């Protein structure tokens, strides 16, 4: 397996982890996403990611999956620079009638901006 992948320990798995991060501090809000964070609860302190992409905001499964892929990839690239916290990225508004390519570009641009701001 490649060392460039996002390992299982870098993701949130339990509902309690998601709840704690969502109740934590809101770090960023953009046109599409809200980023919330809480102190890391895992033993090896590292940045971990959870995604909440609701069907009400992105009706098609292909759209939801594309958004999740783009967000995971953006997080994977910035993971080492981020503080050791549990992050949850939540889609908070309806996705407009964009092509999948335009949606991926918009999601990546916003994710990079949020992670860049958090890493500073």
Curated annotation (Swiss-Prot):
Q: Which InterPro entries match?
A: Ribosomal_Su5_D2-typ_SF, Ribsml_uS5_D2-typ_fold_subgr, RNase_P, RNase_P_CS
Output the Gene3D superfamilies linked to this UniProt entry. Answer: 3.30.230.10
For this chain, the annotated S-S bridges are: none
Q: Which GO terms describe its cellular component?
A: ribonuclease P complex
Provide the alphabetized UniProt keywords: Endonuclease, Hydrolase, Nuclease, RNA-binding, tRNA processing
Its EC top class is hydrolase
Pfam hit, one: Ribonuclease_P
**Keyword Glycoprotein part of the UniProt annotation:** no
What catalytic activity is recorded? Endonucleolytic cleavage of RNA, removing 5'-extranucleotides from tRNA precursor
Q: Which GO terms describe its biological process?
A: tRNA 5'-leader removal
Q: What is its EC number?
A: 3.1.26.5
GO molecular function ontology, one term from the record = tRNA binding
Q: Which NCBIfam families does this entry report, sorted A to Z? A: PRK00038.1, rnpA
Q: What does this protein do?
A: RNaseP catalyzes the removal of the 5'-leader sequence from pre-tRNA to produce the mature 5'-terminus. It can also cleave other RNA substrates such as 4.5S RNA. The protein component plays an auxiliary but essential role in vivo by binding to the 5'-leader sequence and broadening the substrate specificity of the ribozyme.
According to the record's subunit comment, the protein's assembly and interactions are: Consists of a catalytic RNA component (M1 or rnpB) and a protein subunit.
What family is reported? Belongs to the RnpA family.
Recorded protein name is: Ribonuclease P protein component
Organism of provenance? Bordetella avium (strain 197N)
């Amino acid at each position: 397996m490649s060392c460039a992948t996002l390992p299982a320990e870098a993701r949130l798995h339990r509902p309690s982890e998601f709840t704690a991060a969502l109740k934590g501090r809101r770090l960023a809000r953009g046109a599409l996403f809200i980023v919330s964070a809480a102190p890391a609860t895992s033993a090896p302190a590292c940045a971990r990611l959870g995604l909440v992409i609701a069907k009400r905001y992105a009706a098609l499964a292909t759209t939801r999956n594309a958004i999740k892929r783009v967000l995971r990839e953006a997080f994977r690239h910035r993971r080492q620079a981020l503080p050791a916290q549990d992050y949850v990225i939540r889609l908070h508004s309806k996705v407009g009638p964009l092509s999948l390519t335009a949606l991926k570009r918009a999601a990546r641009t916003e994710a990079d901006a949020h992670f860049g701001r958090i890493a500073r």
